[in-house]
């Protein structure tokens, strides 16, 4: 190998020996300029390549995207993938915020809107954006079902487009276990910072898991890039049945890939296979929160609990439990 390298270097050495001392100095100076310039251009190219192009989401103008793919997750839940303008584009949504999805009724011309949070990541998923949609079909309690979810269920791949408005919501995950909350004018305005460097707890009910997935993915992406906070992520996820658990494979993989750091616990109204079900049964209780999530008594002050679920879950289960455990509003972020 050494002799091979010497053979390659011989013409270069001969060329340098043929130069005068002044010529050698000039050549060395030119070579150093070339190397510095090449390094600079390479770094610029690398930055451009690593930074995706964000969509111009301004909260007012609709972004129209075509449906690319449908993945059936359960009997009433789908993953919808929408195509972005190029493979280098990212959706451009800050972590923790959401968008308003708008569709037009073909028969009446009436527009219908509903908030959704993507489960894909701008940093990890270029060229597309993914949404998990639970379709609310008509039933005895709600004869019309969910209008927007049924309209999304009818969208066809390669034929239809959907309008998106955003970003919306005043809460952001800004990295390294820190959140910001936009304060209302009545509260004096400005931005409040929340410290969750030690632990983040999450309570989700049904489709309320989607904003949690977005945030967890970003936190774990930071870990891969050398981030250390938050030190622990605990998720308590409630559903009607085991079959209704959305993105369970993804959640279980988080726990497997980051043992000791990510903990996922489920509770269902009724377990179809009681002998095989190792988690809880019933509504979320004070005891579940105390056992699986951070509290002031065991976690100190640097934690936040993120909550997203139906109003009855909040009113009759979560809020009373928080009060008993003395978990104040300063430690709770609700989506």
Can you annotate each of these PLM segments?
Residues 2-40, 232-335:
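Reductase modules of NAD(P)H-dependent flavoproteins
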Residues 37-57:
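Transmembrane-helix exit/juxtamembrane "anchor" motif
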Residues 52-165, 239-241, 252, 267-271:
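Ferredoxin-reductase
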Residues 118, 209-226:
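Histidine-anchored nucleotide/phosphate-binding helix
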Residues 168-195:
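A short, basic/flexible loop-to-alpha-helix module at the beginning of a structural domain
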Residues 193-198, 299-301:
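Short helix-loop-beta connector
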Residues 199-203, 304-306:
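Conserved beta-strand elements of the Class I
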Residues 206-211, 310-313:
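Gly/Ser/Thr-rich loops at beta-strand to alpha-helix junctions
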């Amino acid at each position: 190998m050494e002799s091979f390298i010497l053979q390659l270097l011989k013409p270069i050495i001969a060329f340098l020996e043929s130069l005068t001392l002044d010529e050698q100095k000039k050549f060395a100076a030119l070579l150093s300029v070339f190397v510095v310039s090449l390094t600079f251009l390479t770094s610029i190219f690398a930055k451009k390549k690593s930074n995706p192009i964000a969509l111009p989401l301004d909260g007012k103008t609709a972004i129209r995207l075509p449906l690319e793919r449908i993945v059936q997750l359960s009997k009433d839940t789908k993953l919808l993938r929408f195509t972005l303008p190029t493979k280098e584009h990212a959706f451009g949504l800050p972590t923790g915020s959401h968008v308003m999805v708008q569709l037009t009724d073909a028969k009446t011309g009436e527009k219908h809107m509903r908030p959704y949070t993507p489960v894909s990541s701008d940093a990890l998923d270029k060229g597309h954006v993914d949404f998990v949609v639970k379709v609310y079909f008509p039933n005895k309690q709600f004869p019309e079902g969910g209008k927007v979810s049924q309209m999304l269920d009818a969208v066809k791949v390669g034929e239809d487009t959907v309008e998106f408005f955003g970003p919306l919501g005043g809460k952001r995950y800004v990295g390294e276990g820190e959140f910001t909350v936009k304060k209302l004018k009545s509260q004096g305005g400005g931005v409040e910072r929340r410290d969750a460097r030690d632990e983040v707890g999450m309570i989700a009910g049904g489709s309320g898991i989607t904003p949690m997935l977005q945030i967890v993915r970003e936190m774990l992406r930071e870990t891969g890039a050398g981030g250390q906070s938050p030190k622990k992520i605990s998720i308590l996820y409630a559903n009607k049945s085991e079959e209704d658990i959305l993105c369970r494979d993804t959640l279980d993989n988080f726990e497997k890939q980051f043992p000791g750091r990510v903990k996922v616990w489920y509770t269902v109204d009724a377990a179809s296979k009681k002998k095989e079900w190792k988690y809880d049964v019933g509504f979320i209780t004070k005891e579940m929160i105390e056992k699986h999530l951070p509290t002031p008594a065991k976690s100190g002050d640097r934690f936040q609990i993120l909550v997203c679920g139906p109003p009855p879950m909040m009113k009759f289960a979560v809020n009373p439990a928080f009060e008993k455990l003395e978990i104040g509003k300063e430690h709770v972020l609700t989506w």
